[in-house]
Amino acid sequence: MADGGGGGSGGAGPASTRASGGGGPINPASLPPGDPQLIAIIVGQLKSRGLFDSFRRDCKADVDTKPAYQNLSQKADNFVSTHLDKQEWNPPANDNQLHDGLRQSVVQSGRSEAGVDRISSQVVDPKLNHIFRPQIEQIIHEFLVAQKEAAVPALPPEPEGQDPPAPSQDTS
């Protein structure tokens, strides 16, 4: 998975069934809701199936059509232009210093946080209950069923070629 950050299996392999201290297998069903190990196991399952990448692509395809994104983009353009207008051009100046100064100004202004929250409200929130949650619940259900099946020992196969014992006929 090449998602540009945070991809990978995320511990969905055999390590997801062991404690981080190298202990024995963990039964996810025995962990309480909210347990960090359970959360890590579930997140690993979601990552290994590409669900986060799918959500990211879905949201990214939708984001630039939203007014909050367009508004934030315009404000960012204006902020950068204003910041650069205040800078004195110095050819030997390090571009990284200019980038860092701009980044610090954006963070200190606090404008981007509110804009990102509005974008999230317009893009992510509508998809949360109707698209994302059902997919997450389905994967969790499949994972827990597989864990339960793996925890139940298989019944020995019935011997072939033997007739089952005849039912006793009590004539009393």
Curated annotation (Swiss-Prot):
Belongs to the BOD1 family. PANTHER family: BIORIENTATION OF CHROMOSOMES IN CELL DIVISION 1 LIKE 1 (PTHR47391:SF1). The keyword Protein biosynthesis does not apply. Residues 154-172 have a biased composition (Pro residues). May play a role in proper chromosome biorientation through the detection or correction of syntelic attachments in mitotic spindles. It is found in: Cytoplasm, Cytoskeleton, Microtubule organizing center, Centrosome; Chromosome, Centromere, Kinetochore. It comes from Homo sapiens. Residues 1-35, 151-172 are annotated as: Disordered. GO terms for biological process: cell division. Keywords: Cell cycle, Cell division, Centromere, Chromosome, Cytoplasm, Cytoskeleton, Kinetochore, Mitosis. Residues 1-13 have a biased composition (Gly residues). It comes from the Eukaryota. InterPro entries: BOD1/SHG1_dom (IPR055264), BOD1L1 (IPR043244). One of its GO terms (cellular component) is kinetochore. This is Biorientation of chromosomes in cell division protein 1-like 2. Pfam families: COMPASS-Shg1 (PF05205).
